[in-house]
Regions:
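Ankyrin repeat domain, specifically the short helix-to-loop turn at the C-terminus of the second helix
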Residues: 24-31, 56-64, 90-98, 123-130, ...
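Conserved ankyrin/ankyrin-like repeat signature
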Residues: 21, 53-54, 87-88, 119-120, ...
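Ankyrin-repeat boundary/"N-cap" motif
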Residues: 4-10, 35-42, 68-75, 102-108, ...
Length: 176
């Protein structure tokens, strides 16, 4: 099977959740395992499609959980957070993924906010993601997670983040 056919077969097997087909197609071939597509790595695709069993398999096989890819040049964590797959978010964090806040587009918290996934937001906050970092870019200016949630009409998430920001300030005041 030629490379493009193999890649398409793997991508389709991941989308359908066919773990045995994925295992057979990748086998022990490290080159195929570490293929980067226009959609990102196989881990990005599995995270986007909510395929937990395949995510676990790929991580076990050795795909870097911090690999950058997809249209935002972001991690699979950002993809899973944006889709609302809290179990995959939890697994990737347990597997050592970094909470990348280097840009708004890479920030998994902003992806979860945009998607309206409060449970993912809460988990990321519990794991210590920086909720006060501010970004200025294409359509945002000095915007932190709270303002981003308000901007996109995620009122319940915005209220939660405001409480967390206030708690953070109170802890700092008590510490001083």
């Amino acid at each position: 099977m030629e490379k493009n056919s193999v890649n398409k077969a793997i991508r389709n097997a991941i989308k359908r959740g066919e773990i045995n087909s994925v295992k057979e197609l990748i086998g022990s071939n490290k080159t195929i395992l570490h293929t980067m597509t226009s959609f990102g790595s196989w881990l990005h695709i599995a995270a986007k499609k909510g395929q937990m069993e395949i995510v676990e398999y790929l991580v076990h096989k050795g795909i870097d959980v911090n690999i950058k890819g997809d249209i935002f040049d972001a991690s699979p964590l950002r993809v899973a957070a944006g889709e609302g797959y809290v179990e995959i978010v939890q697994y990737l964090i347990q597997s050592g993924v970094k909470l990348d806040v280097s840009s708004a587009k890479r920030n998994p918290l902003f992806a979860a906010i945009y998607g309206g996934h409060k449970e993912v937001v809460e988990h990321l906050v519990d794991q210590g993601i920086d909720i006060s970092v501010q970004y200025t870019g294409e359509n945002i200016e000095d915007m932190d997670a709270y303002r981003y949630a308000k901007e996109f009409g995620q009122i319940e998430i915005a209220e939660y983040l405001k409480r967390k920001l206030n708690e953070k300030v109170q802890k700092r005041v008590l510490k001083d």
